[in-house]
């Protein structure tokens, strides 16, 4: 074994973009190179515990014989000298007010320390690479995320509709209940759409370390966290998908919706135009009226049919196998250029 992967985020009960990345890398890298990769999973007592006992305490000991330690979910042991870390965005540095005060203080110091001490930083978009260069003073290799083959226009919406109580047509948003997802604008957009007879439903869980807007009495229906098995059908059954985020390091739900043949309305902000390309409609995230108007355009059959081929082609360009190969190429470069480190640990 040459490279140990931190598997903590892969076993978290919540499932956002970071956790999806961790799960996919923990599965695909050992399959790609079984002689190179192994996964370190925390014991049950530490797997879901708040704090950093695993990353900063147990994990460095587990990785002591590894040539490299790969952290796929923003975190790595600060004192470990052979980290490769995937940092998905620099949101905590760009806008600390999106987070609880304690989280912003701790991670605002921890993220730059991890990044500057790493052998290599990987990030998920050119946008995030620019943010890390500006705010943390580090260069990052860009490796985009992927879309699982489960997300397809043929996904059956029936089980998701039945389980979640969805009867009529709906517009979907999949996003955690955190401030940078622009929930205030989403809720106002939902109210505007409801006045026009359009139902907006929102799926995603809360994270206590992040600040979030409170849902008003009128607005989108809140589904809460949705089981992963229902997501493809939920996307495929939607009349349109909307993600009005102020800040995304990548924007994976947009690609998942595209892969299911659902027209996407995205904020023209952060990494979303980079990820979605010309396969989505865009709106100013600060203007709920513009978002609602873009959703209405997405519901027009002539618009949605015009975007369908581009959306399917765009989503097909992002695969988790390609992500794994991209990360492995970064590891190859490190092990190949640092031959002394590689030889030393190969002998152990």
Label each PLM-derived region with a short phrase.
Residues 1-348:
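Carbohydrate transferase catalytic cores enriched for Leloir-type hexosyltransferases
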């Amino acid at each position: 074994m040459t490279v140990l992967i931190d598997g903590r985020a892969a076993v978290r009960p919540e499932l956002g973009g970071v956790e999806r990345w961790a799960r996919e890398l923990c599965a695909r890298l050992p399959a790609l190179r079984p002689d190179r990769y192994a996964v370190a999973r925390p014991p049950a007592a530490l797997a879901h515990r708040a704090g950093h006992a695993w990353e900063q305490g147990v994990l460095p000991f587990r990785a002591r014989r590894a040539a490299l330690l790969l952290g796929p979910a923003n975190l790595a042991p600060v004192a470990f000298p052979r980290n490769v870390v995937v940092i998905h965005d620099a949101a905590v540095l760009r806008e600390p007010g999106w987070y609880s005060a304690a989280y912003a203080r701790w991670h605002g110091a921890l993220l730059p320390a991890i990044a500057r001490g790493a052998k290599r930083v990987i990030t998920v978009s050119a946008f995030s690479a620019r943010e890390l260069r500006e705010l943390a003073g580090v260069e990052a290799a860009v490796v985009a995320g992927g879309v699982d083959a489960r997300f397809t226009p043929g996904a059956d919406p029936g089980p998701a509709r039945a389980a979640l109580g969805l009867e009529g047509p709906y517009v979907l948003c999949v996003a955690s209940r955190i401030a940078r997802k622009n929930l205030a604008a989403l809720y106002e957009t939902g109210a505007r759409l409801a006045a026009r007879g359009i139902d907006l439903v929102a799926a995603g869980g809360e994270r206590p370390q992040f600040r979030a807007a409170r849902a008003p009495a009128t607005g989108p229906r809140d589904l809460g966290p949705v089981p992963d098995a229902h997501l493809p059908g939920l996307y495929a059954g939607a009349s349109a998908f909307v993600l009005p985020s102020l800040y995304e390091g990548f924007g994976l739900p947009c690609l998942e919706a595209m892969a299911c043949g659902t027209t996407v309305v995205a904020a023209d902000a952060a990494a979303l135009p980079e990820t979605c390309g010309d396969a989505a409609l865009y709106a100013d995230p600060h203007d709920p009226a513009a978002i609602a108007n873009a959703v209405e355009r997405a519901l027009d059959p002539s618009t949605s049919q015009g975007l369908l081929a581009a959306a399917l082609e765009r989503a097909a360009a992002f695969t988790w196998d390609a992500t794994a190969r991209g990360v492995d190429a970064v590891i190859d470069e490190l092990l190949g250029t640092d031959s002394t480190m590689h030889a030393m640990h190969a002998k152990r």
